[in-house]
């Protein structure tokens, strides 16, 4: 076990997930196969996301560690009174990949539209613009895509991923020809996904070496309900 991370508790009580070295390494191999740029050029990240959340603490920190990259800790964040610090940091550090939640992208896009110095520094080396944690609105996507193309003279990849604490975290990436707002993507390399009827919806279920074996100290009868006979983890997400 590398660490314990708690689920967000947004729909149920938070549960502890034993996150293993295998889960983390499988995730990073998924990412490397999806983003071969990481092998060509060691990634440079500026990141404010908390390490007790799987996006920041497993996904982003792991990208730097696995690929011999660099991660700078951003002491700003996309909230009132804090985002100016992020802007200052981005004028000092040009990331090769920038990862954020949609709220962060909304704030940054507005700043990029107004600040030429920021555009020059931010777009100097960046090859991938990545969001996760929630959906980026179509309007937000289009604004970001427009400012990137205007400044760089070409498209910069805007991508997203679907994941969760229990899978450390990746399950799907927006690869392939269809990349747009609202699209959750295709299964990550090594991840199997099936959709199971659940009422009038479909439940998202996953299987792979990146999936936890079970929650920490959850009763056996409760553990048995989260995995089916084929070994798929039932996420409870539609």
Show the residue positions of the predicted features:
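Conserved AMP-binding A3 loop
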Residues: 2-29
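Conserved G/P- and acidic residue-centered "switch" motifs that form tight phosphate/ATP-binding loops
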Residues: 9-10, 68, 163, 208, ...
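Structural detector for helix-capping/boundary residues
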Residues: 21-22, 49, 191, 236
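Conserved AMP-binding/adenylation subdomain of ANL enzymes
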Residues: 25-47, 51-120
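Thr-Gly-centered strand-to-loop micro-motif
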Residues: 48, 74, 131-132, 196, ...
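Gly/Ser/Thr-rich phosphate-binding loop
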Residues: 67-69, 87, 96-99, 109-183, ...
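Short Gly/Pro-enriched turn/cap motifs at secondary-structure boundaries
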Residues: 178-187, 228-230
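Conserved ATP-binding/catalytic segment of the ANL
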Residues: 202-238
């Amino acid at each position: 076990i590398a660490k314990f991370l708690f689920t967000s508790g947004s729909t149920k009580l938070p549960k502890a997930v034993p996150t293993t070295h295998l889960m983390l390494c499988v995730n990073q191999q998924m990412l490397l196969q999806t983003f071969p740029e990481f092998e060509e050029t060691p990634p440079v990240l500026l990141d404010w996301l908390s390490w007790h959340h799987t996006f920041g603490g497993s996904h982003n920190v792991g990208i730097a560690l696995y690929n011999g990259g660099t991660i700078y800790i951003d002491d700003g964040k996309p909230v009132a009174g804090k985002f100016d610090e992020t802007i200052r940091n981005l004028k000092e550090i040009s990331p090769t990949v920038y990862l954020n939640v949609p709220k962060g992208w909304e704030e940054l896009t507005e700043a990029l539209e107004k600040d030429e110095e920021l555009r020059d520094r931010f777009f100097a080396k960046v090859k991938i613009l990545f969001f996760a944690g929630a959906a980026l609105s179509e309007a937000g996507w289009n604004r970001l895509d427009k400012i990137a193309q205007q400044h760089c003279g070409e498209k910069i990849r805007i991508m997203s991923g679907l994941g969760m604490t229990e899978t450390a975290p990746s399950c799907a990436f927006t690869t392939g020809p269809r990349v747009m707002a609202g699209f959750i993507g295709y299964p990550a390399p090594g991840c199997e996904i099936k959709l199971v009827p659940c009422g009038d919806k479909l439940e998202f279920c996953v299987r792979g070496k990146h999936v936890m074996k079970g929650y920490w100290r959850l009763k056996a009868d409760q553990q048995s309900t989260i995995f089916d006979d084929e070994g798929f983890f039932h996420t409870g997400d539609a």
